[in-house]
Amino acid sequence: QGAELQGQMVLDYIKKNADTIDRNGDGVIGYVLAIGDIGHNDSIARTRGVRSALGTGVDADGGVDSTPAGTNVDGKAKVVQDAKIDVDGKEFTVRELASQEMKNSAGATWDAATAGNAIGTWEASFGDQIDIVVSNNDGMGMSMFNAWAKDNKVPTFGYDANSDAVAAIAEGYGGRISQ
């Protein structure tokens, strides 16, 4: 249930902030997604929940595909699709620009440092096309928020309601879901 709530929170944020969310004005709401562990049930559910709520999910094996998309510059990745949303008569495309499992070189997953490095790579690739940062947990979300999203005023959504993420809401952290 929490996974769907996280996705709905992101969608509600887009609708509430439609006038300012599209940072470069291209009509595409681009988001990046930090995936904790591709084989972990919580990670699978959270990825599916976000993709389902935003309409970017593609059905696979009876559910929304939770496979990392890698980079998706043109919206043609096979594991996600572009979605359309209408906000007060204005239509936006929602696109998952990039997603990856946050696994470090030692094999540890849900890795905050890897997420902090990933946001730097994604920023170099996508720049102001990134309108939202989404993470399967607050540890990775806070790493991306502190490394890039906070200074660039990009809303970041995590999961777990860690105390640092709750405190960061006053600094622009978009939201978090409590387990």
Predicted features along the sequence, with ranges:
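A residue-level marker of the well-folded mature domains of exported/periplasmic proteins
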Residues: 1-179
